[in-house]
A protein has these predicted regions:
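Short, well-structured hydrophobic secondary-structure segments
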Residues: 56-59, 64-101
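Active-site and ligand/interface coordination hotspots across diverse enzymes
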Residues: 1-73
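Charged helix-capping and loop-helix junction motifs
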Residues: 74-77, 119, 150-155
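Charged, often glycine-rich, active-site loop that binds/positions anionic groups
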Residues: 100-121
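Structural alpha-beta junctions
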Residues: 83-91, 156-171
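Short, conserved loop/helix-junction motifs that constitute active-site signature segments
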Residues: 127-131, 160-162
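Conserved small/polar residues in nucleotide/adenosyl-binding loops
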Residues: 173-175
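Acidic beta-strand-to-loop metal/phosphate-binding motif
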Residues: 135-144
Length: 175
């Protein structure tokens, strides 16, 4: 279980580009040719966790929990299985808000605008990893209601995805 130690404004957060550059370097704990994990170590936040491929399913949850490469939690195990079942060669887990918290009730009450901006850079980057039309699965359910700011975060994602021509899915329904 992960309970945030403090609000993200009080911790050092790597800018997305810096975290991505670090994630491209060899890691002792996992194979970077197989995994994309940004940042590449366990932190109070996470931008991206997934497997590498040319036809990924981008899975979007609310916020990251405890998963790491080769140590997926049940949510990411399901995302990986659903991606494979639906013909994708990989999955990329992204979250509406990047703060780690096993329980959404533990998420910060007020969003960190800087962290959100960096998270949107991560989302835009994910869309470029897809050969062809990016497929984005809105996999968050009713938990989105836990914090009022989450819907504004999703609106930003929709704008970014629209510029890339992404197709959104809700469960097995095309939206």
């Amino acid at each position: 279980m992960h309970i945030p130690k403090q609000d993200t404004a009080g911790i050092d957060v790597l800018p997305f580009e810096e975290a991505l550059a670090a994630a491209q370097r060899p890691q002792a704990d996992y194979d970077v040719s197989r995994w994309l994990y940004v940042p590449p170590t366990y932190e109070e936040y996470r931008y991206i966790l997934g497997t590498r491929g040319v036809h990924p399913l981008i899975c979007v949850g609310i916020n990251p929990s405890t998963a790491e490469p080769d140590r997926l939690d049940p949510t990411l195990q399901s995302a990986q299985r659903i991606a494979r079942f639906n013909g994708y060669d990989s999955f990329l887990m992204f979250n509406v808000y990047a703060q780690r918290a096993t329980r959404p009730d533990d998420m910060e009450k007020t969003p960190n605008a800087w962290l959100h901006g960096e998270n949107m850079k991560a989302f835009a980057y994910l869309l470029t990893l897809c050969r062809g039309t990016p497929a984005v699965w809105a996999a968050w359910g009713s938990i989105i209601e836990k914090r009022a700011y989450l819907s504004a975060c999703v609106a930003d994602m929709l704008e970014i995805a629209g510029r890339q021509g992404a197709v959104w899915y809700l469960s097995l329904i095309h939206i």
